[in-house]
Amino acid sequence: MNSEKKSYALVTGACSGIGYQFARALAARHYCLVMVSNRDKEIHEAATRVAGDYGVDTRPLCLDLARPTAARELLDFCDGLDVEVLINNAGVFSFADVSPRTPPFLELILGLHVETLSKLTVLFGERMKQRGGGYILNSSSLAGYFAFPGISLYAATKGYVRLFSESLWYEYRPHHVTVMALCPGAVATDLYGLPTFYQNLGVRLGIICRPEKMVDKALNRLFKGRRVYIPYPLLNVPMKWMMELLPSGLIRFIYQKVKRFQK
């Protein structure tokens, strides 16, 4: 990619965690950045750090991506920019049973993981077709492959993201636009509510991956035209099949144990 052309990468959920690492990795590849988050102070600070470290143009935007109008607002914000890469990373997570208190969270998670992600993919995908090519990475999850209590909403929406992205890979491929679903297992971020001690322990045991390592490998696969990427396949691919075969009693037992580690 020629930096003189000022090609941009748009990253949602970019102020921390996986999204921030995507922003840094893309800046290292000489992309200018549009960095989006619903935390105003944090996204401006993150954009300033990335610009200082890599010398690229960064444009921070504080925006609630769960709003029905968010995708169109973001498209308008990027008007006139040559957006070559879209990283749909923004998301939420809750480990809890479905209850009468669920509907507000249901609206939030559907807005982020389904509605806005889909709209951004289609809107920017059309612009990429017009420019002659581009790359879209949609963050799914290994959880999108199986059912598990406590993450019913999260897993269902991530399953949608995976299937939506895989289908669009075929539709957009003739237009030189790659759409890839990223399906990680456990990642060492604060999204899942796992205390830092257990995050670090998981990394040492090799069952939780560092976001910066995963991000770099994911981008390499995206730029090679992959349809799906499951990081750490020797661990996560067998895990995917194993979870589908577990008896219900063992799943309930694991569920009760996992609840103890939530903040």
Regions found by a protein language model. Name each.
Residues D76, V85, F93-E107, G150:
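Conserved mid-core segment of classical short-chain dehydrogenase/reductases
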Residues R29-E45:
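Conserved glycine-rich Rossmann-like NAD(P)H-binding loop of the short-chain dehydrogenase/reductase
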Residues Y170-L235:
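SDR active-site lid
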Residues K41, L61-E73, P103:
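The beta1-alpha1 cofactor-binding region of Rossmann-like NAD(H)/NADP(H)-dependent oxidoreductases
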Residues S141:
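Residue(s) in the substrate-gating loop at a strand-loop-helix junction
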Residues T121, T157:
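Active-site helix of classical SDR
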Residues G13-G17:
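Conserved glycine-rich cofactor-binding loop
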